[in-house]
C-alpha cells in the first residue's frame, strides 16, 4: 500500500482500493478498543510515499472521489487531505491559490453528498464504482457517485427518472490541469469568483467517458 504507483495503475482496482483496504485493517482494533468509534485519516493524498507527477491534474480526481466514497462504506469519520496550498498535490496551487481539479471535486462532494451512506447494490468492477448517499440539501431522494475507472470503455447509466447530473472530466486528457463540469471549464472568474458548480437536467441514458466521474442527484 505505502509505495509509489506508476501512472498506468491509477485507474486499477488495487490502486483505487488502497484507502478502503487500510481502513479495514484497523476496524478490528477499533471494534475491540473503541467500539463504534470514528476512524480518521489524518493525511491523505500524496502525503505518504509520494512523488507522483499527476497530483495537480484531473488524473487524481477518480482516486480522491473513490477514496471518499469507499471510506464511507467501511466507517464514518474525517479524511484530511495533505495539503491545502503547498506542494504539487495541494488543493490550491502554491503561490497563486488557484483551485486545482481535486478542489472542485471535493467541493462538489461536500455540496451534494449527505451524511447517510447506503449500499448502492452494485458490485465494484472496472468501469463501475458506484456510491450512494442521502441528499445534502435534505430533500427526499438519493445522490449517486459513479466513477468510470476504465481507460477505454464508456460507462452507460440508465436513469430511472429525470436527474440532475454533474459530469467531471479532464479538459483535454486525464492529465489536464483543468477539469470540466458538464463540458465547461472550471476556473476562477473576475475577482477570483468561483465558477457556477451547476448541474444539468438529464433523462434516459447518461454516458460517462473513460476516466470520468459523475454525481447523479435523483
Model segments located where?
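C-terminal non-catalytic regions of proteins with extracellular/luminal or membrane-system context
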Residues: 113, 117-123, 156, 188, ...
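Active-site-proximal beta-strand/loop segments in catalytic clefts of secreted hydrolases
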Residues: 1, 42-45, 81-85, 146-150, ...
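Acidic, Ser/Thr/Pro-rich beta/coil linker or hinge segments at domain junctions
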Residues: 159-208
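Noncatalytic carbohydrate-binding groove/subsite architecture in carbohydrate-active enzymes
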Residues: 1-59, 74
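Aromatic/acidic polysaccharide-binding cleft in carbohydrate-active enzymes
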Residues: 40-135
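A structural motif corresponding to the C-terminal end of an alpha-helix
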Residues: 22-37, 70-77, 112-115, 204-210
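Carbohydrate-binding surface patches
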Residues: 126-161, 165-173, 210-217
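Flexible loop/turn segments at secondary-structure boundaries
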Residues: 1-4, 46-51, 86-90, 152-154, ...
Amino acid at each position: 500500500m505505502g509505495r509509489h504507483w506508476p501512472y498506468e495503475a491509477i485507474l486499477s482496482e488495487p490502486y483505487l482500493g488502497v484507502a478502503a483496504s487500510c481502513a479495514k485493517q484497523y476496524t478490528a482494533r477499533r471494534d475491540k478498543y473503541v467500539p463504534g468509534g470514528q476512524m480518521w485519516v489524518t493525511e491523505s493524498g500524496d502525503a505518504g510515499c509520494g512523488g507522483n507527477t499527476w497530483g495537480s491534474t484531473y488524473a487524481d480526481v477518480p482516486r480522491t472521489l473513490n477514496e471518499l466514497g469507499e471510506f464511507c462504506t467501511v466507517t464514518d469519520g474525517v479524511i484530511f487531505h495533505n495539503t491545502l496550498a503547498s506542494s504539487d498535490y495541494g488543493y490550491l496551487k502554491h503561490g497563486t491559490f488557484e483551485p486545482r481539479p481535486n478542489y472542485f471535486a471535493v467541493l462538489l462532494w461536500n455540496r451534494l453528498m449527505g451524511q447517510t451512506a447506503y449500499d448502492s447494490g452494485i458490485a465494484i468492477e472496472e468501469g463501475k464504482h458506484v456510491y450512494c448517499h442521502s441528499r445534502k440539501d435534505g430533500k427526499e431522494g438519493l445522490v449517486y457517485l459513479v466513477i468510470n475507472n476504465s481507460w477505454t470503455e464508456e460507462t452507460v447509466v440508465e436513469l430511472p427518472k429525470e436527474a440532475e447530473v454533474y459530469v467531471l472530466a479532464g479538459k483535454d486528457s486525464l492529465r489536464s490541469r483543468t477539469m470540466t463540469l458538464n463540458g465547461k471549464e472550471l476556473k476562477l472568474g473576475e475577482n477570483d469568483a468561483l465558477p457556477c458548480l451547476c448541474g444539468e437536467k438529464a433523462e434516459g441514458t447518461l454516458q460517462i467517458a473513460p476516466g470520468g466521474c459523475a454525481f447523479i442527484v435523483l
